[in-house]
Amino acid sequence: MDTATILSHVDHTLLKPESTWEQIKTLCDEAMEFGCATVCIPPSFVKQAAAYVQGNLKICTVIGFPNGYNTTAAKIFETKDAVENGASEIDMVINNGLVKDRQWDDIAHEIAGIKAACLGRPLKVIIETCLLSDMEKIKLCQLAAKEEVAYVKTSTGFSTGGATREDVALLRENLPASVKVKASGGIRTLEDGQAYLDLGADRLGASALVGEARKQG
């Protein structure tokens, strides 16, 4: 798999709380130069970024990020605001407290409400695999498939761990072909990226891969 193909699966990401507009512009420029799938940026920059790229790049943003324990109403409002501001894709964080309490209906209701607020834009459900048992991961795959989301995403990158090869394989095995897998967190080399794609991931959340590609020349 060549570098360009790997980068075409990348959500070029900058979600640090101290991110500046100049850094976001650079991120967008890099993503357009290297043919990334999207940039994944904080909600506060979506409107500016959408105007800046003028339709030449998809803008992904995050909802309930990074802890996921916002109320469902707050997450739906965030989603509507992001869509209105020009977001092309939405990455939402589930409430893992609800997972631990086995409140599956509440989780499904939240996913459905946020998906409706996306107005047809792809929804990625971040499940934070490092906090979950395999049983919980599989159950969330089942819920996500039932709600017909676009992706299940491994991680925020802000918890105790990121993507692992074992988790990506587990998610892929427990999702229908219609629901894709996004691996995120700790993907630092192009070799890592290819390994996750080979395991069945379709999207990579990463901040380092464009820099790695630039070093290769």
Regions found by a protein language model. Name each.
Residues 50, 70-81, 132-143, 166-173, ...:
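Catalytic cores of alpha/beta
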Residues 6-14, 39-41, 58-63, 90-92, ...:
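Hydrophobic faces of well-ordered beta-strands that scaffold small-molecule active sites
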Residues 1-29, 169-181, 187-217:
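Alpha/beta catalytic cores of nucleotide-metabolism and tRNA/nucleoside-modifying enzymes
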Residues 61, 65, 84-99, 146-161, ...:
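Glycine-rich phosphate-binding active-site loops on the catalytic face of alpha/beta enzymes
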Residues 43-67, 102-129, 162-189:
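Alpha-helix-loop-beta-strand connector modules within alpha/beta enzyme cores
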Residues 28-36, 121-124, 148-153, 175-179:
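Short, surface-exposed connector motifs at secondary-structure boundaries
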